[in-house]
């Protein structure tokens, strides 16, 4: 009888463990107090490795591919400083940024979210520190153009490219929303920088490597960075449907010159587009999709 009871309890604990693992939100943290280039690189690799399917490979390459949708919908990213923590919420199946959490100037945790990407109930599960009363749907939309407009950097030809990237800039922009009264301009600038330093860096090793090369200093993004960001789906689709053994069947131009070798793109993570194509399918005409929405439903 004792053996039976112990076995029953063990089974119940195992089931409970499985439930909590399924329902829990995975968190990945970057400590911004004297970070090193190696720590940042490891942080980006953790994001990439956490959402990839190790059994998926496209186009005969070793590039990581996001896994298919699962019960665990979101990934939590924490930025820690000596003054506290600011967090982002990412969708696991595409790394779109859906929400962020920060303390206000009265030390109350408040969550802000894009209503088309996440519900209030999901926001509560992602950021339990913020009660429903302390949640707010953002007034602007989740595309780069809308965020840039609210960041007030769109005069003339200016865009997020002029805002720049870099670990020091990420720290500065984080502190502008950490334990402060909400200022939309500061919030939008933080989102632009954080999006590119997390989701975009995980997708594109090219961006990750630029941050490491300039570490920890701020640097202006180049046009190639922007072209990568708006062409993630197009690049993923081309590799998925028109590459064999890491070579495209024709030259592709994604906005920064012709490319034939997939490795020259320095990709980090591909969009999930289904099971890998067979060799015959890969040599056929590549399928065409609608406009890409890279990080935040971006066109």
From Swiss-Prot:
- What Enzyme Commission number(s) appear in the record? 3.2.2.22
Q: Where is the signal peptide?
A: 1-24
Q: In which tissues is it expressed?
A: Seeds and leaves of the plant.
The answer on whether this UniProt entry bears the keyword Phosphoprotein reads no
Query: Does the keyword section mention Cytoplasm?
Result: no
Q: Which residues are glycosylated?
A: 283
User: Which enzyme class?
Assistant: hydrolase
Which reaction(s) does its UniProt entry say it catalyses?
A: Endohydrolysis of the N-glycosidic bond at one specific adenosine on the 28S rRNA
Per the Swiss-Prot or TrEMBL record, the active site comprises 200
| Residues excised as propeptide | 278-299
Instruction: Give the keywords, sorted.
Output: Glycoprotein, Hydrolase, Plant defense, Protein synthesis inhibitor, Signal, Toxin
Q: Which GO terms describe its biological process?
A: defense response; negative regulation of translation
The UniProt entry, under InterPro entries, shows: Ribosome-inact_prot_sf, Ribosome_inactivat_1/2, Ribosome_inactivat_prot, Ribosome_inactivat_prot_CS, Ribosome_inactivat_prot_sub1, Ribosome_inactivat_prot_sub2
Q: Which GO terms describe its molecular function?
A: rRNA N-glycosylase activity; toxin activity
Function in brief? Ribosome-inactivating protein of type 1, inhibits protein synthesis in animal cells. Useful as immunotoxin for pharmacological applications.
**Similarity field:** Belongs to the ribosome-inactivating protein family. Type 1 RIP subfamily.
- Tell me the protein's name: Ribosome-inactivating protein saporin-6
Protein's organism: Saponaria officinalis (Common soapwort)
* Gene that encodes the chain: SAP6
């Amino acid at each position: 009888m004792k053996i039976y009871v112990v076995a029953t309890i063990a089974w119940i604990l195992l089931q409970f463990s499985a439930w909590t693992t399924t329902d829990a939100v995975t968190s990945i943290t970057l400590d911004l107090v004297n970070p090193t280039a190696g720590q940042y690189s490891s942080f980006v690799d953790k994001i990439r490795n956490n959402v990839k399917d190790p059994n998926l490979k496209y186009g005969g390459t070793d590039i990581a591919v996001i896994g298919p949708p699962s019960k665990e919908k979101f990934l939590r990213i924490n930025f820690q400083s000596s003054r506290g923590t600011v967090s982002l919420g990412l969708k696991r199946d595409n790394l779109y940024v859906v929400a962020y959490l920060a303390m206000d100037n009265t030390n109350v945790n408040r969550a802000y979210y894009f209503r088309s990407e996440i519900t209030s109930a999901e926001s509560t599960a992602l950021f339990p520190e913020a009660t429903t009363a302390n949640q707010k749907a953002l007034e602007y939309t989740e595309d780069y153009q809308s965020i840039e407009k609210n960041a007030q950097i769109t005069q003339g030809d200016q865009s997020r490219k002029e805002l720049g990237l870099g670990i020091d800039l990420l720290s500065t922009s984080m502190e502008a929303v950490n334990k402060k009264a909400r200022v939309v301009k500061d919030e939008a600038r933080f989102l632009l920088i954080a999006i590119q330093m997390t989701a975009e860096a995980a997708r594109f090793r090219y961006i990750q490597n630029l941050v490491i090369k300039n570490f920890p200093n701020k640097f202006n993004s180049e046009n190639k960075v922007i072209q990568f960001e708006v062409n993630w789906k197009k690049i993923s689709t081309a590799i998925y449907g028109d590459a064999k053994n890491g070579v495209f069947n024709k030259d592709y131009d994604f906005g920064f010159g012709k490319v034939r070798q997939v490795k020259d793109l320095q990709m980090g993570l591909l969009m999930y587009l289904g099971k890998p194509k067979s060799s015959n399918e890969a040599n056929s005409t590549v399928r065409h999709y609608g406009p890409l929405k890279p990080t935040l439903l971006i066109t």
